[in-house]
Amino acid sequence: QSSAGGWFATIPADAITPPGAAYYIVGTTADGEVAHFASAAAPQPIRIEPTLVDRLEQLDDARLDGRRESVSLDLDGHDFGNRYGNLDAFLRAELRWTHRVSRTLHSVGFGFGSIWGRTPDSDGAFAEEQVALGRYGIAEVRVRAHPSVFIDGRLALGVSDEGFLRGGGGAITLGKPWRSNVSMGADMLDDLGPTAFVRLQWDTAWPVLMGASIVRTDLPDAQVSANGLYIKYDLGYRVNPTLSVRGAVSYGSRDGAGRFGGGVGVQTDF
């Protein structure tokens, strides 16, 4: 009995399991038990519903069988070609580690990236090719603003062939990143130039994920034109519960006829 009047009971938290608990109140008299509220045959239920964030975390854990870490390696590049036959191409590699929190803060991560490229230093048949190089570290964060809205942010610091390199970027995904969605985003790496994309992903042939993108980029520090544009088609496949692979092909140009590019990637979850 409470000192403030009335009666109360405390149930240990570890004794409660979803969807909740049930109780009844009886008293003991000389004639036996007297039911005051509900009964053993018909107890009063108390439902304990998890919050939306808790439910989403449980769904993530069930989908990934409790695996919260991932390591991925991606390699992408494109040859833009040039109407004068000069080389205009880039190759970009990134190694990333991600820890999934699976709450409103969905994941955090860090990684390392490298960019190599050659591009004409001017417009014309006698332009010389300049080399563009960059090495940088990445810090990433993903926020689940809604069950089907994810917002990504990243910062990059490193060095390029011209000195200190800073960068940043962001993206928004409408839908589930691991199923059908539409995403758009951009990033910038100081003197190496900006990149922006719009991508549609669909899962009609699960477990194969397919995607189509439009990408505009100045990589690798293009001097001829800022209109490097290509389309990209990619396929992702989950080989087993812990291993996924990706392949992509791209086609587009900057100054002249279109050329091909592509990419590969691998990710392991643990």
Which sequence ranges carry the predicted segments?
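Glycan-association/targeting regions that enable binding to alpha-glucans and other polysaccharides
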Residues: Q1-A89, F110-F112
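Residue-level signature of outer-membrane beta-barrel architecture
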Residues: H99-V101, V141-A145, I172-K176, L200-T204, ...
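Outer-membrane beta-barrel "beta-signal"
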Residues: G258-F270
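Glycine- and aromatic-enriched membrane insertion/assembly motifs of diderm outer-membrane
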Residues: L87-L157, G169
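Outer membrane beta-barrel transmembrane domains
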Residues: D123-E128, F197-A248
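Transmembrane beta-barrel strands of outer-membrane/channel proteins
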Residues: V71-G77, V108-W116, G153-V159, G170, ...
